[in-house]
């Protein structure tokens, strides 16, 4: 699901996507939580984290249970064609988990070049406290 249909409800008609309808029809709904892709202007690291926080807040306002969502993070900044630093990704995961998000994913997974480095991101996937 494009994040824009959550943050800008008027775009639901353009994409024919709706978080509440998807959540009612599927066990899980993957949300493209990709701040560097969704915004027209380049974002700083701090702005990207703030954008993710706003996205979670909008999902909570939708009354769709967070455990029915998967927040799919971007591992590449397609604007710069550079990997998102693994430390930034783990910071995003920490932020999302603090907000109650349980299901995390990322794309793309360049396992042949260990990007993002598994030893860095794997511990962040644990929801154990």
Please place each PLM-identified region on the residue numbering:
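Aromatic-lined carbohydrate-binding surfaces of glycoside hydrolases
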Residues: 1-8, 33-37
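Distinct, well-ordered alpha-helical segments
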Residues: 7-22
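Substrate-binding cleft of secreted/luminal carbohydrate-active enzymes
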Residues: 25-42, 48-52, 58, 62-129
